[in-house]
């Protein structure tokens, strides 16, 4: 490809990715699948390898989503909520495993929901925020209080500030009921459970969020070493002990063969789960 054509392609990819970021994270109205979006991001990284999430805050791939909607207070994340890297093929996975070396890995499914930050002060839930653009999100505390499974008080009083992160979702059965109700009322249907969860969590009226049967899975403790936790597997166990809902598919894999066995187990098995996964 000629240099001029490469520049034009890079510019088109930047604009297209930014447009889809806005559709997905701000308007909750995606036009393409996550897989197609990931391919656009991968192509941009290959054509413009200097662009990444850390070095170029103006690049669309330095952002997770779009600007927060007006109507909610803004929340600046102390540690940015960045998206995960992807492996599309067995070759991609093999390359990652070789780079990682001889280490045990905690494997788990990725929930197709809305990423949130939950803050506890002395063991009491005090604030919930959306990911937003990864650096600035929206304060949706009152809506998150309505979420099924959210512990308003932890089983153990942890002094000071504790931040955990997870996904808000609507389970498949609840999504079907919600769309059936909307159809009866002549309202537009949600495209998928993720869109329904995002739209519900960002309602200005908490009673609407409460009526949507939102669920929660938590998977991360920010600054986990402060709690004496040094592995993701330990983090998940501690989250359960503190009263958080954890999805429960995690498996500690000690060899590349065990990693592949986990992937094969859930390649089809994930479709039997009561919620949607996307990785």
Can you say where each PLM-predicted feature lies in the sequence?
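RNA/tRNA-interacting regions in translation and RNA-turnover enzymes
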Residues: 1-278
């Amino acid at each position: 490809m000629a240099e001029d054509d490469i520049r034009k392609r890079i510019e088109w990819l930047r604009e297209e990715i930014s447009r889809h970021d806005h559709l997905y994270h701000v308007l909750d109205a995606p036009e393409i699948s996550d897989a197609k979006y990931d391919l656009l991001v991968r192509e941009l990284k290959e054509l413009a390898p200097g662009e990444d999430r850390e070095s170029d805050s103006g690049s669309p791939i330095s952002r997770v989503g779009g600007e927060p909607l007006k109507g909610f207070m803004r929340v600046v994340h102390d540690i940015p909520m960045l998206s995960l890297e992807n492996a599309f093929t067995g070759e991609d996975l093999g390359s990652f495993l070789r780079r990682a070396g001889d280490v045990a890995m905690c494997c788990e499914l990725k929930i197709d929901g809305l990423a949130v930050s939950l803050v506890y002060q002395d063991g009491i839930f005090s604030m919930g925020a959306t990911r937003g653009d990864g650096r600035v999100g929206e304060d949706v505390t009152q809506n998150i209080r309505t979420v099924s499974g959210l512990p308003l008080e932890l089983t153990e009083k942890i002094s000071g500030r504790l931040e955990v992160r997870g996904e808000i979702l609507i389970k498949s059965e609840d999504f079907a009921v919600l769309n059936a109700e909307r159809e009866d009322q002549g309202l537009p249907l949600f495209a998928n459970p993720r869109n329904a969860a995002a739209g519900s969590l960002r309602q200005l009226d908490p009673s609407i969020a409460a009526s949507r049967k939102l669920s929660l899975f938590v998977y991360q403790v920010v600054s986990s070493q402060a709690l004496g936790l040094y592995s993701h597997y330990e983090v998940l166990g501690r989250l359960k002990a503190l009263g958080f809902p954890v999805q429960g598919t995690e498996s500690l894999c000690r060899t590349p063969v065990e990693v592949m066995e986990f992937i094969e187990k859930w390649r089809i098995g994930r479709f039997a789960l009561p919620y949607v996964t996307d990785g």
